[in-house]
Structure formats: C-alpha cells, structure tokens
C-alpha cells in the first residue's frame, strides 16, 4: 500500500518525519537522517489528524518522558525478507538493553536457519524505516562502541542515556526564569565540587553574572532527569562557552551526551577550560581536544590560567 500521509513531531532530539499508509506507521525518521523518507509516495500529503499519527505522537511523548514498555502504534515495515527478519530481531531487544552486531547476526541466523554476517545485518539495521520504536540505536560495535547510526551518533548516545538513566537532552529555545534559576543552581553545585582553587568570594561574584550568560548564549543545551536539570552546555558558533554537570550526575555520561551534540550537531570545535581543573582538562582530551594556547589569567584578568583547546 502506498505511503500517502505524513506529519511532523518536534522531539527533544530534533524534528521527526512520520509516514503512514493510512492504517499503520510506515516511517519515522529524524531530520537529516540517512535514508529518510524511503518509500514515500511523491503525492504524499500532510495529515496531522490520522489516528495512527496521534498514537505515534503519544508514544513518542511517553518515550521521551522516560516511560518504559509503552504499547507502540501499529507498524508496517516494508523491505526485503532479510531486512524484515533483522527488523523483527531488533524489536525483541528490550528497552534499556543493547546488543552487538555480531550477536544480532547470530539471532537472525537462527531465525533463518543459516549463518549471516554482521556486515549484512548492519546494512539492514541502517535501513530501518522506523527509528526509535524499532530500536536500531541499541546495536553496538563488537567492543561496545557506538557505531553506525543513520540519525547521527550524538542521537544514538542520547537515546541510550535516556533508556539507561532517564536523561533527556534538549535545546532550550525558550529560557523562562525558572529554568535559568535551576541552571544557576546546577552551575554553583558543579563549581563548588570542581573549582576548589577559586579564591574566597569568587563563587558568589561569578554566580551574579551566570543568569545573563545563560540568557545571552546563542545555543543552550539542557540535560534533564525527571524534568529536573542535571547539566547544561552553551555554545556560540564553534565555541563551547560553558559546560556544567551536577556533581550527583558526574560519571554517568551527561557531559558526553551534551558535548557529542555540540560537536556533531552544532559544529562546536573549541573550548576554554581552567588549567587548575585537571578533571575537566582530561575530559576534553578524552574527547579528542588538545590545547593550542594558554593564558595566565582568565577573561576577567583573574589569576586562573586558561587552556584553549581545539578538536583535532
């Protein structure tokens, strides 16, 4: 049956295109995703009120709110018999779990009664027409590394963080006073936990200017758990102006989720970091940044050396 209807959903990870034949969901792609709109009829028309679209939007709202085991809308996945077998195997990978391409290939091989390669399975995974609901983001490389996600590795990392820890990362296009106040609190907790080199009174002095910095930075990414901010990143062009994570959430991938989105989706390539904060320096080095300039004082002329780092 031709795919004749479309609608759009604004997810925390960007706009998504939904497609349907009128009865079932046949496509769900992130903006800019490889193979997006595959099989879409040239005369497909927007139709927001289709019941299956309403069901899909409801599922997506629940999913991005951290709800588990929500009944998905009706699906119709159109592909080759081999692709269909791979997609069926994907649907059996539970929420919050992961599988390697080799493990998935073994499962598909058992279904087919013959051996199949991880490469062939990977190709079919990449052609999955219904992202998120059919969990191709749960497939990892042989050593557990993130590889090959048609919607972008930063989205794969974000989806896995959502399922693992309930962390949702979004761009804050609006910055109400309550959000700014919550982020200032995250900033202070983070600074007090990591910036023990600051002189007395510096935290209070700096806190007074953080609200203006948050409101003025062009791009602001916010990581939340149960609706509460646990980290944030601000970027201006290719420069990361700020990155702070609540100390209770350090070591759980929040900073990595934010930086991955900043570098891959926003084009950020540079950052400055306090030289006296070795954990932060090591974090950026681990992500592939290297120092190219040092200043003996910070931007305000205070005695806090800065390292300017660039993504290799």
Predicted features along the sequence, with ranges:
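Basic nucleic-acid-binding alpha-helical/helix-turn surface characteristic of O6-alkylguanine DNA
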Residues: 1-112, 162-168
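A short beta-loop-alpha structural element at the N-terminal edge
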Residues: 168-185
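Conserved GNAT-fold acetyl-CoA-binding loop/helix
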Residues: 185-211
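A short helix-loop-beta-strand connector motif used in the catalytic cores of GNAT acetyltransferases and
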Residues: 211-222, 239
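Conserved beta-strand in the GNAT
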Residues: 222, 227-244
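Conserved acetyl-CoA-binding loop-helix of GNAT-fold acetyltransferases
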Residues: 245, 251-264, 282-286
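Conserved active-site alpha-helix within GNAT-family acetyltransferase domains
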Residues: 256-257, 276-305
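Conserved GNAT acetyl-CoA-binding A-motif
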Residues: 264-276
């Amino acid at each position: 049956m031709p795919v004749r209807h479309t609608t759009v959903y604004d997810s925390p990870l960007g706009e998504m295109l939904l497609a349907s034949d009128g009865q079932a969901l046949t496509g769900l792609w992130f903006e800019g995703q490889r193979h997006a709109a595959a099989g879409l009829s040239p005369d497909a028309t927007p139709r927001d009120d289709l019941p299956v679209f309403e069901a899909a939007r409801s599922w997506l709202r629940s999913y991005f709110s951290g709800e588990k085991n929500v009944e998905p809308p009706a699906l119709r996945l159109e592909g080759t018999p081999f692709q269909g077998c791979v997609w069926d195997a994907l649907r059996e990978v539970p929420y919050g779990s992961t599988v390697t391409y080799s493990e998935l290939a073994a499962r598909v091989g058992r279904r087919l009664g013959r051996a199949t390669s991880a490469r062939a399975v990977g190709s079919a995974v990449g052609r999955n027409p219904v992202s998120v609901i059919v969990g191709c983001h749960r497939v990892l490389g042989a050593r557990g590394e993130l590889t090959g996600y048609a919607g972008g590795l930063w989205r794969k990392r974000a989806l896995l963080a959502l399922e693992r820890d309930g962390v949702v990362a979004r761009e804050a296009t609006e910055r109400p006073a309550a959000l700014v106040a919550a982020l200032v609190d995250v900033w202070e907790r983070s600074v007090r936990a990591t910036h023990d080199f600051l002189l007395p009174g510096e935290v209070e002095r700096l806190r007074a200017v953080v609200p203006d910095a948050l409101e003025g930075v062009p791009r602001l990414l916010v990581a939340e758990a149960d609706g509460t901010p646990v980290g944030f990143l601000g970027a201006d062009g290719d420069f990361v102006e700020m990155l702070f994570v609540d100390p209770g959430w350090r070591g759980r991938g929040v900073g990595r989720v934010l930086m991955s989105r900043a570098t891959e989706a926003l084009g950020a390539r540079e950052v400055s970091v306090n030289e006296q904060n070795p954990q932060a320096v090591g974090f950026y080095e681990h992500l592939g940044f290297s120092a190219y300039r040092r200043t003996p004082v910070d931007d305000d002329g205070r005695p806090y050396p800065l390292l300017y780092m660039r993504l290799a």
